[in-house]
Amino acid sequence: MPSNLVPQEPCLDVERGIAAMGSPSALRLVLQVAYTSLQQDPPVIAQALAAGDIQPAGKRLHGIKGYLPLFASEALAHGISLLERRCSTEPADTLIAEFRELRPSLAQLLSQISSYLALESLPRQTIADER
């Protein structure tokens, strides 16, 4: 996969997510599910591809492809979408290399989701007027 498909910008787009989901609380719920998926799915995808078992990898990529457009950068969502489609036409060795290119961005997205969820769980502080 050409490296120009690997996103260079932040992977999590909170404004896009809130617009897609309708509210910060709805986005939070989706991000909690995505967080679990992004923890579990990439290692399973890598193992399946390494074993030459493309179908399970494609199914997991299909799931990720379904939610990324809601809150991820366009570049990352596009890259995963292309990889998922290529699961029906390309050999495992090709897919392994392409997934290896995208995996750091998925890890970055996971980290950004974790940070966002941690910030959103903090109690809101009001600043007292110091007059």
Predicted regions mapped to residue ranges:
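Two-component system phosphorelay core
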Residues: 1-131
